[in-house]
Amino acid sequence: MSSLASLIKTKLKLPDSSKNLNKLRWKFRLLESQFALYSLPCQLRFVHYNNLEDPNSFNGLLYLFTDYIAFQGDDESNQFCMPYTIIRKVSRVKSNDLEQLLSVSTSNGYEYRISLQVSETTAAHFCQLLREELVSHKADMQRSSEFSKQFFSERLCKPNVPEPETKDSYGFGARYGYPTDPRISRERAKLRMWKEYFLLYGANLSLIRVSLFSKLVRIELPNKLRGEIWELTSGSMYFRLENSDEYDHLLKVYSGQTSFSLEEIEKDLGRSLPEYPAYQNEEGINALRNVLVAFSWKNQEVGYCQAMNIVAAALLIHCTEEQTFFLMHKICEDYIPGYYSKTMYGTLIDQQVYESLVQRSMPNLHAHFVSKDIQLSIISLPWFLSLFLCTMPLPYAFRLLDFFFLEGPRVLFQIGMAILYDNEAEIMKATEDTMLISILKNYFSSLGDKAYKDATDKRVASITKFQLLLVTAFKKFSHITHSLIEDERKKHYEGVMNSIESFAKRTQIRSLQNYGTLTRTDLSNIYDRYHEVLSSKHRVGLGSSTDTRLEFDEFCIFLAGVTEWAKGLDAAAINNSSSFLRHLFLRFDKSMTGSLSLQDLVSGIAELKFRDVMRNISFIFELYDFNGDGFMDKPDVLKVSEAILWLTRFMGDEYLSAVSEFIQRCFHFADEASPDGHSDTLIDISDHMSSTGSENRSVGANSDIKVSLPTFRMVVLSIGLLEQLFSGGLADSIVLAPVQEKSSTTGGLRGLLDSLVIDTNRIGKTFRGHKPASRPSTANGTSNQNTTSEITTSETTATEKTPSNSSDTEDDVGDVVENDKDLLQFDPYKKNDA
């Protein structure tokens, strides 16, 4: 950082910890690559399309990130985040002791006024730093300008913007029909309100959020805008902008390659929303395949998990393939991390969080589940894993996705709690899992029905069960915030991870073979230490790899934990290619991959722990008989002697003389090698053992010798200390003590793990057999009366009585009319609603 930047940093308010930085990133939905460089207080104003300055202004903080400028108002609903590359011009309008006013113009024609609430000197320094950032991003400005032109908001506000080249720029729904009937949902009225909003407060990359933005999202997004607003509210729009060529690149680079994930994807393609027309032909199936395949290569640690196909298939109805790909990444990384990992640890953590919330908020219902042995997680897990797309009719599930991307994962918990709350009386009658499933299935299929059939008040009588669900979720359970969910996730994290790891441990230990005389306790201790060594780069519960292996340096660390002779190694000892540990590692590596699996390690230790002197002598001999010809040459004998000295360096000086005697006897009894490398004659052991003094045969210093296994065995057995070492001392030096115990696991999780985590067939049946609660209506199909998701209590106006195919394809929607505004009357967040 330059000296100027350092000076400014001392004067401006910056995040003082990584925790605060992560909160800022989440607030603006930015990637981990973004760092908050500077911030300062300011006041934000707007200059509208008619060049009139908006009388309203918003106080807050202005942030400079690595690639973005952002604003967060004192009122949480007021904010913006836009890339530097969308900014065409920044100029100082006026400057005095009270304010330093900047004018910011974007490449798509919007202008904003920012009043810096700092001294003139600080403002000047800030402007210089902003200028440096803009200059450094200048090369990408044209790309951002072209990027913004693809959005429907551009065409809605600027009729001269040409149609996008991609035929599915607004998802499959534009051609195959959207699940939401545009006439019933008053599509054109909503488009008019969004058009007015875009003209006032900017669009796509340059959009400013005010309180009206969230309200427009909550009353249901128009079909053609849904994908764009999902991208904006989730932050995947920024991710796609920064990696605009990645999706096509992945499909091209990995074309023709195979993996286990691809095999699983193929199994599920035909089971992904099969009732939707686009997935009844190859076009839709190919698009879904492309998204899932690209995602599996992009996130190879995750690959593919069942239920991802349901989510991706639903997103494609409103989004392009590329949009869906980046939305999936954002969902998996930021919104519900760990849901689609190999162990589904994120789902299991959230199930614990959900059950704890139920216990606190609805104790009677929780007690009923416990008394009747009803496993709530068996019912709720598919809700969370499929984002309710697997259980609700699509029009309602899409409404929940609108809230989900806007508000974050807390929406899943709020809706989950509201479902139980609104059905508590019926649920209390359930005595087993199947009854609960039946009750909720009937509920989901009737979400379009009136909630208060006997009400005399017209407005109350018009409220549907789905509207009531939203009111319950966002009012009754408004205390469920993003911070609360994050804190609860942290609270349950270790317990869930330990449970998963304990389950995985039991499963893997049962599959081990060739463990000789090792006990179950020994295997357990080896497993624990093995994964303890690997914990710095991998944790079993995260499921990031199915084949974790020890490299050589990690193997040395492992042995240091179970033997005295492997402790205190320096870099030279570890890097010595001729060391005993290197020979031992190569011996353990049966598959010759350069790393050790748990099975390799167990089999190797079982050999070392076998208390048989003849077998142990053969083991050491084979370590140094590299070519497997049954003989050791002179350098090999010296290496064995060095290994014995190294192994016994903590056992006493008497081994020095024993090793010296070992060398002498090996040389004494060895045969000189013939030209073909084999000894000429066998040694007559009885004659040599009786020879003394000058009768002993000496091998020349430069002679090639060969020591056979029988000779090696005879020499070792003739030296008492070495016989003791090989008969039991080596085995006893390996102490398989337990690793320090982890904290106890969460009580009710083991049953869930037993039935769900490993039992993939059961999960597969849940999603592969997916049928919606009721078939969704499409723009070119028949509407189902139970899938109506209107949220207005007024009747459809004459302006909306146009054919569905016309109302949904005509982009010239006109200006907002008075009747449009009654859409805003019902808002589940308002305090005075029923």
UniProtKB/Swiss-Prot annotation:
Location within or outside the cell: Cytoplasm
Q: Which GO terms describe its biological process?
A: vesicle-mediated transport
Low complexity biased stretches: 782-802
Cellular component (GO) terms are:
cell division site; cytosol
Any idea which positions bind Ca(2+) 1? D589, S591, T593, S595, D600
A Gene Ontology molecular function term for this protein is:
GTPase activator activity
Keywords, A to Z, come to: Calcium, Cytoplasm, GTPase activation, Metal-binding, Repeat
Where composition is biased (Basic and acidic residues), the residues are: 818-834
Residue span(s) of domain Rab-GAP TBC: 220-408
UniProt feature, compositional bias: Acidic residues: 808-817
Q: Where is Ca(2+) 2 bound in this sequence?
A: D625, N627, D629, D636
Q: Which InterPro entries match?
A: EF-hand-dom_pair, EF_Hand_1_Ca_BS, EF_hand_dom, Rab-GAP-TBC_dom, Rab-GAP_TBC_sf, Rab_GAP_TBC_domain
Domain EF-hand, chain residue ranges per copy: 576-611, 612-647
Q: Which SUPFAM superfamilies match?
A: EF-hand, Ypt/Rab-GAP domain of gyp1p
Does the entry feature the keyword Cell inner membrane, yes or no? no
Query: Which SMART domains did the record assign?
Result: TBC
The segments labelled Disordered in the record are 766-834
Tell me the superkingdom of the source: Eukaryota
Function field:
May act as a GTPase-activating protein for Rab family protein(s).
Under what name is this protein listed? TBC domain-containing protein C215.01
Q: Which organism is it from?
A: Schizosaccharomyces pombe (strain 972 / ATCC 24843)
